[in-house]
Curated annotation (Swiss-Prot):
PROSITE patterns: G_TR_1, G_TR_2. InterPro entries: EF-Tu_GTP-bd (IPR041709), EF-Tu_GTPase (IPR050055), EFTu-like_2 (IPR004161), EFTU_2 (IPR033720), G_TR_CS (IPR031157), P-loop_NTPase (IPR027417), Small_GTP-bd (IPR005225), T_Tr_GTP-bd_dom (IPR000795). GO terms for cellular component: cytosol. It comes from Pelobacter propionicus (strain DSM 2379 / NBRC 103807 / OttBd1). It catalyses: GTP + H2O = GDP + phosphate + H(+). GTP binds at residues 19-26, 81-85, 136-139. Monomer. This is Elongation factor Tu. The keyword Protein biosynthesis applies. Residues 60-64 are annotated as: G2. Residues 81-84 are annotated as: G3. Residues 136-139 are annotated as: G4.
């Protein structure tokens, strides 16, 4: 059978399955591909193909992740599923699999469990904006009232982590029945219903090019008679020649005008998200701008030194530390293009952090960096990566 060509005309959305071990995340992932394959919108992936996900290295961190793709009438989806709990933690913190929304799988027979809670918390911390729930193994619960209680418990749990628990779609079903091809309300129908909920409840993500302009400065040089050029890859938005931008981070914020945009030695009218450009800046001296700062649309981002973050600390096998660290730990934090020293405050009751742990920390940087919530960073010691993190909230 010839491979169906995915039409790229549909909006693209990244999603993933999250939830407690053995609640049926991988079975559900396989069932989605099976049911949609029946409509010619996916290639069926068996449980074992997904479960034996190859390990990938993302910024030195080993993560096992399965990627499947499929489409509905409305959209094209890239879906991630991880075999182990640790893989989810690493994936969500590093942003290796950036999710526009998640399908939370909860076993109706067990209700919410510790990892259910932890994945919801992580989703909140790392900025997964939308959650849809699949209440799996519903065929194992005969008592309708019990099902309603579990549903209520899930809604309350989601609300306690600032998700709109009352509005979130919860679809009851049996991923196993669907995978076995049973055409019933809890079987294939539940998968169709789930995908309808995902289609309608998770909005189209905002494209990088539609966001406010930002370019991390990688290099700076001066062109005699023309001025100072900052080079880098445009992270988001568009910059047009003649527009005002701010230089943010490290030093006091400065304003300037982009008088030229170059790419591959050619002059352009604008630079867009994804482009590697050189931006010619009016009235800026070579020493007034440096690597680690960003060029940004005025007022769109501000410099900060103190923030809360969710971090994963590499284990020894990943080339991380061999020993724990304690309160007052002072590594470098690598944001976009530069290292900044920061002091780590551990949460009350946490005496130390072991390699392989994930932890919520408060960080005080010695130099301000342009940041907003959701910004990823590496934790380094002398140029060696020992951890990864994401800004969960800004303090000052």
């Amino acid at each position: 059978m010839a491979k169906a060509k995915f039409e790229r005309t549909k909006p693209h959305v990244n999603i993933g399955t999250i939830g407690h071990v053995d609640h049926g995340k991988t079975t559900l992932t396989a069932a989605i591909t099976k049911v949609l394959a029946g409509k010619g919108q996916a290639e069926f992936k068996a449980f074992d193909q997904i479960d034996n996900a190859p390990e990938e290295r993302e910024r030195g961190i080993t993560i096992a992740t399965a990627h499947v793709e499929y489409e509905t009438d409305k959209r094209h989806y890239a879906h991630v599923d991880c075999p182990g709990h640790a893989d989810y933690v690493k994936n969500m913190i590093t942003g290796a699999a950036q999710m526009d929304g998640a399908i939370l799988v909860v076993s109706a027979a067990d209700g919410p469990m510790p990892q259910t809670r932890e994945h919801i918390l992580l989703a909140r911390q790392v900025g997964v904006p939308y959650i849809v729930v699949y209440l799996n193994k519903a065929d194992m619960v005969d008592d309708e009232e019990l099902l309603e209680l579990v549903e209520l418990e899930i809604r309350e749990l989601l609300s306690s982590y600032d998700f709109p628990g009352d509005d979130i779609p919860i679809v009851k079903g049996s991923a196993l029945k669907a995978l076995e091809g049973e055409k019933s309300e809890l079987g294939e129908d539940s998968i169709i219903k789930l995908m309808d909920a995902v289609d309608s409840y998770i909005p189209d993500p905002e494209r990088a090019v539609d966001k406010p302009f930002l370019m991390p400065v990688e290099d700076v040089f001066s062109i005699s008679g023309r001025g100072t050029v900052a080079t880098g890859r445009v992270e988001r938005g568009i910059v047009k020649v003649g527009e005002e931008v701010e230089i943010v981070g490290i030093k006091a914020t400065a304003k300037t005008t982009v008088t030229g945009v170059e790419m591959f030695r050619k002059l352009l009218d604008e630079g867009r998200a994804g482009d590697n450009i050189g931006a010619l800046l009016r009235g800026i001296k070579r020493e007034e701008i440096e690597r680690g700062q960003v060029l940004a649309k005025p007022g769109s981002i501000t410099p900060h030194t103190k923030f809360k973050a969710e971090a994963y600390i590499l284990n020894k096998e990943e080339g991380g530390r061999h020993t724990p660290f304690f309160n007052g730990y002072r590594p470098q934090f690598y944001f976009r293009t530069t290292d900044v020293t920061g002091i780590v405050d551990l949460p009350a009751g946490t005496e130390m952090v072991m390699p392989g742990d994930n932890v919520a920390v408060t960080v005080n940087l010695i130099t301000p960096i342009a940041m907003d919530e959701g910004l990823r960073f590496a934790i380094r010691e002398g140029g060696r990566t020992v951890g990864a993190g994401v800004v969960s909230s800004i303090i000052e």
